[in-house]
Amino acid sequence: MQDTYRIALGADDAATAMKDAMAAYLIERGHRVTDLSAADGEDYPDVAERVARGVARGEHERAVLVCGTGIGMAIAANKVPGIRAAQIPDSYSAERARKSNDAQIACFGSRTMGIEAALVCLEHWLVSDFAGGGSAPKVEKIKQVESRNLTSPGVPAA
């Protein structure tokens, strides 16, 4: 585990308070935080895409997205090739998102959990690293699924 990361933060209008608490928490721990939250008129898919593209390009090592449930952000971020974003409902899922799935982006719901619980989950996610082992072939299969479906021309949308 690294001591500090370059972390992008993104939130929609429903999640400003949680995002601000997370930003303060991350900065206090020495992480370099870039806030890429919604500008006027932007919706969560716009934010998720901007943040996920930055992670995919290597501008950020990890990212945190927050909307009402975390679900929409995760869905949108996962449309960017190379990204594994996980909706985080609890600390065990936060840990497993990193250790088993190598998720670079954690997605939280401001309407589904309190700020303190979210910060506990955020810490579990931050201190966990991809374990490899038996999970490595599964993550490789996820990449193969992505390669076959997200980048194949002529594949009709579902």
At which residue positions do the language-model features occur?
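C-terminal binding/interaction regions
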Residues: Q2-A15, S91-A158
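Glycine-rich phosphate/diphosphate-binding loop of Rossmann-like nucleotide-binding domains
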Residues: A8-R29, V33
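Structural motif
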Residues: G10, L36, V66-C67, I88, ...
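Short, structured coil segments at secondary-structure junctions
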Residues: R29, P81-I83, N101
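A short beta-strand-loop structural module common to alpha/beta enzyme folds
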Residues: R32-E42
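Short amphipathic alpha-helical segments
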Residues: D20-A23, I75-K79, L119
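Helix-adjacent hinge/juxtasegments
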Residues: V47, V51-I88
